[in-house]
């Protein structure tokens, strides 16, 4: 191998290294963009999970309250008091009780 061939080989190798370096830099930028996007998505996911948990908790509280109120209304409709003053006693002639009605009409 003479000097010219050796120089040409080094020049070709140098050109290949420059192309490879450019490809690596492009990959590096792409990975950096993906890492940033991943971080943003993780934060958004965390916030959405917190919001979903909050909504589920609120929904559970509303459901529990509604079930309890429905149960009391059923007892009242069967002719029994649900108020603190006469709880469990039968209402005479299914008369309305203002204390029981106040409990049922609360929101």
UniProtKB/Swiss-Prot annotation:
Keywords: Cytoplasm, DNA replication, DNA replication inhibitor, Metal-binding, Zinc. Disulfide bonds: none annotated. It is found in: Cytoplasm, Nucleoid. The keyword Transcription does not apply. Zn(2+) binds at residues 81, 83, 97, 100. Binds 1 zinc ion per subunit. InterPro entries: YabA (IPR010377). The keyword Metal-binding applies. GO terms for biological process: DNA replication. Belongs to the YabA family. Homotetramer. Interacts with both DnaA and DnaN, acting as a bridge between these two proteins. NCBIfam families: PRK13169.1-1. This is Replication initiation control protein YabA. It comes from Streptococcus equi subsp. equi (strain 4047). The gene is yabA.
């Amino acid at each position: 191998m003479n000097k010219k061939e050796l120089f040409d080989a080094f020049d070709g190798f140098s050109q290949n290294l420059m192309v490879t370096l450019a490809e690596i830099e492009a990959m590096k930028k792409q990975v950096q963009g993906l890492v940033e996007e991943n971080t943003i998505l993780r934060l958004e996911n965390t916030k959405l999970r917190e919001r979903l948990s909050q909504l589920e908790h609120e929904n559970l509280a509303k459901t529990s309250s509604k079930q309890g109120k429905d149960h009391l209304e059923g007892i009242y409709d069967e002719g029994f008091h649900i108020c603190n003053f006469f709880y469990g006693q039968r209402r005479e002639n299914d008369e309305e009780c203002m204390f029981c009605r106040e409990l049922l009409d609360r929101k």
